[in-house]
Protein backbone atom coordinates (compact mmCIF):
# COMPACT_ATOMS: atom_id res chain seq x y z
CA UNK A 1 0.00 0.00 0.00
CA UNK A 2 1.40 3.35 -1.02
CA UNK A 3 1.67 6.16 1.52
CA UNK A 4 0.95 9.74 0.49
CA UNK A 5 2.54 12.35 2.77
CA UNK A 6 0.23 15.37 2.95
CA UNK A 7 3.01 17.80 3.85
CA UNK A 8 5.02 16.77 0.79
CA UNK A 9 1.99 17.03 -1.50
CA UNK A 10 0.86 20.49 -0.36
CA UNK A 11 4.31 21.87 0.45
CA UNK A 12 3.21 23.16 3.83
CA UNK A 13 2.44 22.17 7.42
CA UNK A 14 -0.90 23.96 7.06
CA UNK A 15 -3.74 22.18 5.28
CA UNK A 16 -5.78 25.36 5.17
CA UNK A 17 -7.22 25.89 1.72
CA UNK A 18 -9.38 24.16 -0.85
CA UNK A 19 -6.57 24.63 -3.40
CA UNK A 20 -4.25 22.56 -1.21
CA UNK A 21 -7.03 20.01 -0.73
CA UNK A 22 -7.36 19.74 -4.49
CA UNK A 23 -3.66 18.85 -4.77
CA UNK A 24 -4.21 15.89 -2.45
CA UNK A 25 -7.51 14.99 -4.15
CA UNK A 26 -5.79 14.70 -7.54
CA UNK A 27 -3.44 12.06 -6.16
CA UNK A 28 -6.14 10.21 -4.23
CA UNK A 29 -8.65 10.14 -7.09
CA UNK A 30 -6.04 8.57 -9.35
CA UNK A 31 -5.38 5.86 -6.76
CA UNK A 32 -9.02 5.05 -6.00
CA UNK A 33 -9.97 5.14 -9.69
CA UNK A 34 -7.40 2.38 -10.19
CA UNK A 35 -8.66 0.54 -7.10
CA UNK A 36 -5.30 1.09 -5.38
CA UNK A 37 -5.35 1.34 -1.58
CA UNK A 38 -3.49 4.29 -0.10
CA UNK A 39 -2.46 5.52 3.34
CA UNK A 40 -2.75 9.27 3.85
CA UNK A 41 -0.05 10.45 6.24
CA UNK A 42 -0.68 13.67 8.14
CA UNK A 43 2.69 13.59 9.95
CA UNK A 44 4.06 17.10 10.55
CA UNK A 45 0.76 18.75 9.59
CA UNK A 46 -0.14 21.38 12.18
CA UNK A 47 -3.57 22.58 11.03
CA UNK A 48 -6.42 21.11 8.97
CA UNK A 49 -9.63 22.96 8.10
CA UNK A 50 -12.88 21.81 6.46
CA UNK A 51 -12.26 23.55 3.13
CA UNK A 52 -9.16 21.36 2.76
CA UNK A 53 -10.87 18.10 3.74
CA UNK A 54 -13.98 18.87 1.68
CA UNK A 55 -11.84 19.04 -1.48
CA UNK A 56 -9.35 16.31 -0.59
CA UNK A 57 -11.79 13.72 0.74
CA UNK A 58 -15.41 14.81 0.23
CA UNK A 59 -14.94 15.26 -3.50
CA UNK A 60 -13.86 11.61 -3.81
CA UNK A 61 -17.53 10.64 -3.54
CA UNK A 62 -17.99 11.91 -7.07
CA UNK A 63 -16.16 8.74 -8.16
CA UNK A 64 -16.45 6.18 -5.33
CA UNK A 65 -18.97 5.21 -2.69
CA UNK A 66 -18.52 4.96 1.07
CA UNK A 67 -17.75 1.23 1.03
CA UNK A 68 -15.02 1.71 -1.57
CA UNK A 69 -13.65 4.65 0.41
CA UNK A 70 -13.38 2.54 3.55
CA UNK A 71 -11.67 -0.22 1.57
CA UNK A 72 -9.15 2.03 -0.17
CA UNK A 73 -8.30 4.98 2.11
CA UNK A 74 -6.33 4.64 5.33
CA UNK A 75 -4.65 7.18 7.60
CA UNK A 76 -1.45 7.15 9.61
CA UNK A 77 -2.06 5.47 12.98
CA UNK A 78 -1.18 8.53 15.03
CA UNK A 79 -3.40 10.97 13.12
CA UNK A 80 -4.61 13.89 15.23
CA UNK A 81 -8.18 13.29 16.47
CA UNK A 82 -9.24 16.78 15.39
CA UNK A 83 -7.96 16.11 11.86
CA UNK A 84 -9.91 12.85 11.79
CA UNK A 85 -13.05 14.64 13.02
CA UNK A 86 -12.65 17.17 10.22
CA UNK A 87 -12.26 14.39 7.64
CA UNK A 88 -15.28 12.52 9.00
CA UNK A 89 -17.36 15.71 8.91
CA UNK A 90 -16.45 16.20 5.24
CA UNK A 91 -17.30 12.58 4.43
CA UNK A 92 -20.66 12.77 6.21
CA UNK A 93 -21.50 16.10 4.62
CA UNK A 94 -20.51 14.91 1.16
CA UNK A 95 -22.39 11.62 1.28
CA UNK A 96 -25.50 13.23 2.77
CA UNK A 97 -25.59 15.96 0.12
CA UNK A 98 -25.18 13.41 -2.65
CA UNK A 99 -28.01 11.27 -1.24
CA UNK A 100 -30.26 14.33 -1.01
CA UNK A 101 -29.38 15.38 -4.56
CA UNK A 102 -30.07 11.90 -5.88
CA UNK A 103 -33.45 11.80 -4.11
CA UNK A 104 -34.39 15.22 -5.50
CA UNK A 105 -33.37 14.23 -9.02
CA UNK A 106 -35.34 10.98 -8.81
CA UNK A 107 -38.39 12.91 -7.64
CA UNK A 108 -38.01 15.39 -10.49
CA UNK A 109 -37.67 12.60 -13.08
CA UNK A 110 -40.70 10.84 -11.65
CA UNK A 111 -42.75 14.06 -11.89
CA UNK A 112 -41.65 14.54 -15.51
CA UNK A 113 -42.60 10.96 -16.37
CA UNK A 114 -46.01 11.42 -14.73
CA UNK A 115 -46.61 14.62 -16.71
CA UNK A 116 -45.67 12.89 -19.96
CA UNK A 117 -47.81 9.80 -19.29
Range-by-range predicted roles:
Residues 19, 51-55:
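Generic recognition of short, well-ordered alpha-helical segments
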Residues 44-52:
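Acidic, metal-coordinating catalytic cores used for nucleic-acid/nucleotide bond scission
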Residues 1-39, 46, 59-117:
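STAS-like cytosolic regulatory interaction modules
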Amino acid sequence: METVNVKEVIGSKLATSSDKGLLLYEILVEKVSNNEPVTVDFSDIKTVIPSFTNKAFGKLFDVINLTEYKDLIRYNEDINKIFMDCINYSIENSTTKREQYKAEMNKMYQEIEEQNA
